[in-house]
């Protein structure tokens, strides 16, 4: 039964083909939006990036185990 279904399905109407086209169109849209924003000179929009000032450190650092370069940055 599944074999017959696969034979009847054309490559153009398969689920995988449709999903690939949706992903491809989405990527093209994001790229074109980024180019348009760059041309207009506006700020870049970032997806799923949390602002740095909203992140609070939850770890306490023991400075004895840090390399010198890291201690200088702290």
UniProtKB/Swiss-Prot annotation:
Q: Which residues form the propeptide?
A: 45-74
Its localization reads: Secreted
Q: What is its main location?
A: secreted
One Gene Ontology biological process: antibacterial humoral response
> In the record, which residues are listed under signal peptide?
1-13
Q: Which Pfam families match?
A: Cecropin
Keywords linked to the UniProt accession: Antibiotic, Antimicrobial, Secreted, Signal
Q: Which PROSITE patterns match?
A: CECROPIN
Give the protein's recorded name.
Cecropin-P2
- Species per Swiss-Prot/TrEMBL record: Ascaris suum
Quote the gene name from the UniProt entry.
ASCEC-2
